[in-house]
Amino acid sequence: MPWIQIKIITSKQHDNLLETLLLETGAVSVTFQDAGDQPIFEPLPGELKFWDDIEIAGLYEADNNLHEHQTKIAAAINKIKAMCEPGQHFIYKIEHLEDKQWEREWMIHFHPMRFGQRLWVCPSMQAVPDPSAVNVILDPGLAFGTGTHPTTALCLEWLDSLDLQNKILIDFGCGSGILAIAALKLGAKQAIGIDIDPQAIEASRDNAQRNGVSEHLVLYLSGQEPKNLQADVVVANILAAPLCELAGVIADLVKPDGYLGLSGILNTQSDKVSQAYQHAFCLYPIAEKEEWCRITAVKNKNDGI
């Protein structure tokens, strides 16, 4: 089925009203993205950040009711124009889109990737480049983590560099489960994934089953993990603000002499995150990839944050 897409560029104060108007005129989905190039870093707990200028896209079915949809869209545009105050900009365009299986379309451009010396992440639809390597089979899905982002790549390269034989690893903020699964395939005897998102737990479980390691992966929604839980290796690829806020919680998960890997950190945020952990850990040199970095450390025998 072909589709009609209306894209609107305007100020952020119209976001809720525009979303309502698009849905009321028959849009089957409404998405938001940055209309310019404004970086938005992670919000503090309870804070909601949004771009100043937004692009809102409404997607409509181009079926037998095409004329009706176009009439409704035109009416919506007129309403939106009337809302704009003098000096506020409003740009829109209407596009006709061919029908595609969008997830499959994205997967066409997702190729096998190598991390370190042993580890590959490969989509299920493509041949594994090196069958003798450590291969994680992973497709794009609902939860974060396929290896394409620099922070995930930094964590995978670090895991590949470790001797994980018979080790227990905690993946704090597990997303797709890619780091926990990679650790198991690299020799860890058990991996524990923790996340605040039920979709991440589901995605991690499905991906572990696909990779044949589900028996060795334990998953918890955040807050439901056992007390006094500890592991030989802890990796947390989240964001700088929660890494700082939860420094005590994350540090307690690492056994004395255990290893910690942190990412989701911009290069400009590395000092702040390092300071949150330096009292309990001996920090290694920071690794960088593009504008992102990874902090690694070993826990002191007598720690305290």
UniProtKB/Swiss-Prot annotation:
Its EC number is 2.1.1.-. It catalyses: L-lysyl-[protein] + 3 S-adenosyl-L-methionine = N(6),N(6),N(6)-trimethyl-L-lysyl-[protein] + 3 S-adenosyl-L-homocysteine + 3 H(+). S-adenosyl-L-methionine binds at residues 152, 173, 195, 237. The keyword Membrane does not apply. One of its GO terms (molecular function) is protein-lysine N-methyltransferase activity. InterPro entries: Ribosomal_L11_MeTrfase_PrmA, Ribosomal_PrmA_MeTrfase, SAM-dependent_MTases_sf. It comes from the Bacteria. Belongs to the methyltransferase superfamily. PrmA family. This is Ribosomal protein L11 methyltransferase. The lineage of its organism: Bacteria, Pseudomonadati, Pseudomonadota, Gammaproteobacteria, Enterobacterales. The gene is prmA.
